[in-house]
């Protein structure tokens, strides 16, 4: 019985130690969430403004033949996949990698996030770069550099389409693995936008097509950076939720173990009293 009580006591200490770690990770994730949410909120208007600008340019010259708008047969796709740099975030990594794994056809992958790189190296998928890009540390400048490489490869015909797979941050409790088509652009101006473009006095120099092409790298960089911001916020929210659940489970386990310990201790005391009484009667 003494051995059993000692084992229970050791297990209680082990669970308490684990609970301290999960609680600390929950607090760290919570403290980083405010900044991550601000980045998401600030990145969305940039993308929306660029998309609106491109739509206006396309509406002003609907006959323009731009390589970023063409719809040739898609034989090879560049797939940008954003996952986390660490685990302990519930189903965050597995959900986005499962979403990416559903992509059909020939692909070359640009992984962002350590877990994304490890996954595609393990599955021997052709990679756009051998450099491991950490999702939590990638900067705006690096996104612009990637954008230039991506658009250059697209113009050269190294791939016929560009897609991005990331986790959209809906709320603290909801994050959704999403695939978005980046290139070629899906821009269909409405009749109202076309009418407004005809009435507009805007002149594009040297030409609307060249201005359109010049904006594309900015647009792609905005998508990549925005998707990274959304994914980082989603990872932190998922980790906070997972660590909160783990902390609560650890607390419940400690309560149960304390109950078992008290029962074992009571049984040991009862046995000692019984033995003393039996010895006295003899």
Placement of each model-derived feature along the sequence:
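C-terminal beta-strand-loop-alpha-helix "lid" module of Rossmann-like NAD(P)-dependent dehydrogenases
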Residues: 1-282
């Amino acid at each position: 019985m003494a051995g059993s009580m000692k084992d229970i006591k050791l297990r209680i200490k082990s669970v308490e130690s684990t609970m301290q770690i999960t609680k600390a990770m929950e607090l760290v994730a919570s403290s980083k969430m405010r900044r991550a949410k601000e980045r998401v909120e600030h990145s969305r208007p940039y993308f929306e403004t660029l998309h609106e600008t491109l739509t206006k340019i396309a509406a002003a010259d609907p006959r323009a033949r731009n390589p970023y708008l063409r719809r040739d047969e898609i034989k090879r796709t560049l797939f940008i996949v954003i996952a986390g740099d660490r685990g302990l975030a519930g189903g965050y990594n597995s959900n986005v990698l499962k979403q990416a794994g559903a992509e059909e056809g020939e692909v070359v992958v640009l992984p962002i996030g350590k877990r994304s790189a490890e996954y595609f190296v393990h599955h021997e998928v052709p990679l756009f770069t051998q450099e491991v890009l950490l999702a939590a540390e990638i900067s705006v400048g690096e996104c612009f550099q990637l954008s230039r490489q991506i658009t250059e490869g697209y113009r050269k015909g190294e791939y016929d389409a560009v897609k991005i797979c990331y986790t959209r941050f809906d709320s603290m409790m909801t994050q959704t693995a999403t695939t978005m088509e980046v290139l070629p652009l899906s821009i269909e101006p409405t009749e109202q936008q076309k009418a407004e473009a005809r009435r507009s006095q805007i002149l594009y120099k040297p030409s609307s097509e060249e201005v359109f092409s010049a904006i594309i790298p900015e647009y792609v960089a905005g998508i990549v950076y925005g998707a990274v911001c959304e994914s980082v916020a989603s990872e932190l929210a998922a980790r906070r939720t997972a660590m909160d659940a783990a902390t609560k489970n650890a607390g419940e386990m400690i309560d149960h173990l304390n109950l078992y310990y008290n029962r074992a201790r009571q049984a040991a005391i009862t046995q000692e009293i019984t033995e003393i009484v039996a010895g006295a009667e003899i």
